[in-house]
From Swiss-Prot:
Taxonomic lineage: Eukaryota, Metazoa, Chordata, Craniata, Vertebrata
Cysteine pairs bridged by disulfides in the record: 67-80, 70-88, 91-106, 109-123, 113-131, 133-144, 150-168, 171-186, 192-211
Name of this protein: Tumor necrosis factor receptor superfamily member 21
Record note on what altering residue 289 to Q does: Abolishes one glycosylation site and reduces total N-glycosylation
UniProt keyword annotations, A-Z: Adaptive immunity, Apoptosis, Cell membrane, Disulfide bond, Glycoprotein, Host-virus interaction, Immunity, Lipoprotein, Membrane, Oxidation, Palmitate, Receptor, Repeat, Signal, Transmembrane, Transmembrane helix
Record organism: Homo sapiens
Bilayer topology annotation: Single-pass type I membrane protein
GO biological process, one term: oligodendrocyte apoptotic process
Lipid tethering residues (S-palmitoyl cysteine): 368
Name of the coding gene: TNFRSF21
Length: 655
C-alpha cells in the first residue's frame, strides 16, 4: 500500500524535530563539560599562584636554593636545604608579618597608642597596631581634639570623622537650631496647618514656630429660659469681638450710629432674656457653665464676625433646654500668611547662578574644541610631509626645522632621524602604529596609502603628521606603540643608537630613497655611502651636544626590561642599575605611596647584618628603597636584576 501525502509530511516533520532535539542536547552537554573543566582548572591555577618563593644561600654548601615562603603571621626559623624544607614559626607577641615572606625575624609592632588615642587595630600576628581618635574627637597635629560644637542658630553641615572636624552652617530659612550640638543638623519648623493649628509666633533661626488652637465656643449645658448668655453688659463688652472699624473720637454721629446699629439689637435680645417660662423653672435656676476662650487675635474683620454672632444667638435660644451636641466654631483667626512674593535677593541665588555660568562656559569650550577637531580630521594630509611641516609652522611657534631637529639624534657628527629609522623597519605595520598613536580614522590612513607608493614613505609621512598634530608627541609614546605591536627589535635599535659605545651599522639605518620629496635634503658629504642613507651629516652646535635627547621619560622606558650593560655611560659609577631607572622608580613611589615591605623581604638574603642595620635605621620607606638601590646596585648583576624583578612584580604600574 502507498502512503498518503499527509502521513509522509508528518513523518518528515517528526524527523526534523528529533534532529533538532538531538543537536540541542549535544550542544548543552558540550557547554556543561566546558564549564566543569574551567571551574576545575581555576582552583589549580590559584593554588599554583598562591605559593611564593625566595632565594637562600646555603652556608654549608654555598649553593643558591629556592625555598617556599612562609605564610603571613609567621617567619622562617630554618631555611630549606637540599634534603629538607624550610620551617616556619609563628610570630611572637609584639611582632607581625603582613605578607608571605622569607625573613628570619618578624617585624616589631608600633608603639602603644598615646592618650587620648585608642587602638583601631590591635597588634597581632597579621596586623600592626593602628591608633585612632575616640568618638567625638578628630586627629589634629598628632593629637586628638574634640569636634567643634555648633552654636544656637547653627547646624551641622558635615559630620566630623576621625580625621576631620565638624563643619557648621547657619540655619537657612524655614529651619532652626535651639541647642548647641556637634551632631545635630538644623530642624524644620513645625507645620501648624497639618495639626489644624495656627501660627501664633513665627519661628526664627533659634526658635521653632509657636502653634495655637482655633477659636471656638463650647458649652457643657444649654442655657435655660430666662438666663442670658452674657449676664452683665460688662461681661459682654469684655468678650465682644473688637472691630477693625473702631470709631474714634471726633467721628460724626451718623457713621457711629450706622456702625453700632447691629449690636444694640443683639444685646437687647440677649439681656432681656424674655423666654416663655414653661415647666422648666427649676432648670432655669441651674447654673450654666460656659467656656469663653481667651485668644490672641491678630487681624479682625468686622462683617463676618457680626454675622456670626447674629446667627449664633438665635440658635442658642431656639434650643432652649436641650444640650448642644455640636461645638460652636468661631471664625478662623491666626497669624497672617507670609507674603510669598518677596523681593528678589541676589545673594541667595548667587551660588547656583555662578555654577550655571561655569557650566555654560564649559559647554562652549567643548563645542568649539569638537568643531575644531572635526575640521582638522576632515582635511586629511594628502600632500608631502614637507608641506605639512610648513603649514603647521604658520600656526605653531615651533618651526618645521625645530620640529624636525627634535627627532634627530647626533652621533659622531651625523644626524640620524629617528622617524626614518622607525619607518624603514615597521613596513606595513605603520597603519596599526599610526592608529594607535593618534586614533586616526580609516579615511586618514587611506589618504596616506593613496598618496605614496612605498610603505616606508607612507610610514614616514604618517609619523611626521603625528608629530605635527600635537605638541605632546614624544619618544616615549613611540616606544610604547612599538612595544604594543611587538616590535621590540626596533626599540633595541633605538636603544643601541642612544648608547654611547654602541654604533649602528650605516647600511642597517639606510632608508631607500625615492624621487618623491619625502626625505629632507641632507647636507652634502664626500662619503657616497652616507648620501644614500637616512643619515643627516649635520654638525651639532655645542648647545645641542650638551642638551639631553628627548627630555622626558623615554630613556627609562628603553631600559625597563633589564639592567644596563657594564659599558654603558650611565653605569660608569659602578652600579648595575642606572640612575635614570632608579629615579623613575623612586619618583613613582613618592607620587603613589604603597607597601614596600615585600621588596625588602625579597632582598634580605643579599644583605649582610651591617647593611640591614643601616637600612632599618632609615625612617621613611622611600628613603629605605633608595638606600637599597645603592647597596644592591654595586653587589652583582644578579642581585640588581633580582631587585628590579621584585620592584616590577610588586609595583606593576611601573611597567
Amino acid at each position: 500500500m502507498g502512503t498518503s501525502p499527509s502521513s509522509s509530511t508528518a513523518l518528515a516533520s517528526c524527523s526534523r524535530i528529533a534532529r533538532r532535539a538531538t543537536a540541542t542536547m549535544i550542544a548543552g552537554s558540550l557547554l556543561l563539560l566546558g564549564f566543569l573543566s574551567t571551574t576545575t582548572a581555576q582552583p589549580e591555577q590559584k593554588a599554583s599562584n598562591l605559593i611564593g618563593t625566595y632565594r637562600h644561600v646555603d652556608r654549608a654548601t654555598g649553593q643558591v636554593l629556592t625555598c617556599d615562603k612562609c605564610p603571613a603571621g609567621t617567619y622562617v626559623s630554618e631555611h630549606c636545604t637540599n634534603t629538607s624544607l624550610r620551617v616556619c614559626s609563628s610570630c611572637p607577641v609584639g611582632t607581625f608579618t603582613r605578607h608571605e615572606n622569607g625573613i628570619e625575624k618578624c617585624h616589631d609592632c608600633s608603639q602603644p597608642c598615646p592618650w587620648p588615642m585608642i587602638e583601631k587595630l590591635p597588634c597581632a600576628a597579621l596586623t600592626d597596631r593602628e591608633c585612632t581618635c575616640p568618638p567625638g574627637m578628630f586627629q589634629s597635629n598628632a593629637t586628638c581634639a574634640p569636634h567643634t560644637v555648633c552654636p544656637v542658630g547653627w547646624g551641622v553641615r558635615k559630620k566630623g570623622t576621625e580625621t576631620e572636624d565638624v563643619r557648621c552652617k547657619q540655619c537657612a530659612r524655614g529651619t532652626f537650631s535651639d541647642v548647641p550640638s556637634s551632631v545635630m543638623k538644623c530642624k524644620a519648623y513645625t507645620d501648624c496647618l497639618s495639626q489644624n493649628l495656627v501660627v501664633i509666633k513665627p519661628g526664627t533661626k533659634e526658635t521653632d514656630n509657636v502653634c495655637g488652637t482655633l477659636p471656638s465656643f463650647s458649652s457643657s449645658t444649654s442655657p435655660s429660659p430666662g438666663t442670658a448668655i452674657f449676664p452683665r453688659p460688662e461681661h459682654m463688652e469684655t468678650h465682644e469681638v473688637p472691630s477693625s472699624t473702631y470709631v474714634p473720637k471726633g467721628m460724626n454721629s451718623t457713621e457711629s450710629n450706622s456702625s453700632a446699629s447691629v449690636r444694640p439689637k443683639v444685646l437687647s435680645s440677649i439681656q432681656e432674656g424674655t423666654v416663655p417660662d414653661n415647666t422648666s423653672s427649676a432648670r432655669g435656676k441651674e447654673d450654666v457653665n460656659k467656656t469663653l476662650p481667651n485668644l490672641q487675635v491678630v487681624n479682625h474683620q468686622q462683617g463676618p464676625h457680626h454675622r456670626h454672632i447674629l446667627k449664633l444667638l438665635p440658635s442658642m435660644e431656639a434650643t432652649g433646654g436641650e444640650k448642644s451636641s455640636t461645638p460652636i466654631k468661631g471664625p478662623k483667626r491666626g497669624h497672617p500668611r507670609q507674603n510669598l512674593h518677596k523681593h528678589f535677593d541676589i545673594n541667595e541665588h548667587l551660588p547656583w547662578m555662578i555654577v550655571l555660568f561655569l557650566l555654560l562656559v564649559l559647554v562652549v569650550i567643548v563645542v568649539c574644541s569638537i568643531r575644531k577637531s572635526s575640521r582638522t580630521l576632515k582635511k586629511g594630509p594628502r600632500q608631502d610631509p614637507s608641506a605639512i611641516v610648513e603649514k603647521a609652522g604658520l600656526k605653531k611657534s615651533m618651526t618645521p626645522t625645530q620640529n624636525r631637529e627634535k627627532w634627530i639624534y647626533y652621533c659622531n657628527g651625523h644626524g640620524i632621524d629617528i622617524l626614518k629609522l622607525v619607518a624603514a623597519q615597521v613596513g606595513s605595520q605603520w597603519k596599526d602604529i599610526y592608529q594607535f598613536l593618534c586614533n586616526a580614522s580609516e579615511r586618514e590612513v587611506a589618504a596616506f596609502s593613496n598618496g605614496y607608493t612605498a610603505d616606508h614613505e607612507r610610514a614616514y609621512a604618517a609619523l611626521q603628521h603625528w608629530t605635527i598634530r600635537g605638541p605632546e608627541a614624544s619618544l616615549a609614546q613611540l616606544i610604547s606603540a612599538l612595544r604594543q605591536h611587538r616590535r621590540n627589535d626596533v626599540v633595541e635599535k633605538i636603544r643601541g643608537l642612544m648608547e654611547d659605545t654602541t654604533q649602528l651599522e650605516t647600511d642597517k639605518l639606510a632608508l631607500p630613497m625615492s624621487p618623491s620629496p619625502l626625505s629632507p635634503s641632507p647636507i652634502p658629504s664626500p662619503n657616497a655611502k652616507l648620501e644614500n642613507s637616512a643619515l643627516l651629516t649635520v654638525e651639532p652646535s655645542p648647545q645641542d651636544k650638551n642638551k639631553g635627547f628627548f627630555v622626558d621619560e623615554s630613556e627609562p622606558l628603553l631600559r625597563c626590561d633589564s639592567t644596563s650593560s657594564g659599558s654603558s655611560a650611565l653605569s660608569r659609577n659602578g652600579s648595575f642599575i642606572t640612575k635614570e631607572k632608579k629615579d623613575t622608580v623612586l619618583r613613582q613611589v613618592r607620587l603613589d605611596p604603597c607597601d614596600l615591605q615585600p621588596i625588602f623581604d625579597d632582598m634580605l638574603h643579599f644583605l649582610n647584618p651591617e647593611e640591614l642595620r643601616v637600612i632599618e635605621e632609615i625612617p621613611q620607606a622611600e628613603d629605605k628603597l633608595d638606600r637599597l638601590f645603592e647597596i644592591i646596585g654595586v653587589k652583582s648583576q644578579e642581585a640588581s636584576q633580582t631587585l628590579l624583578d621584585s620592584v616590577y612584580s610588586h609595583l606593576p604600574d611601573l611597567l
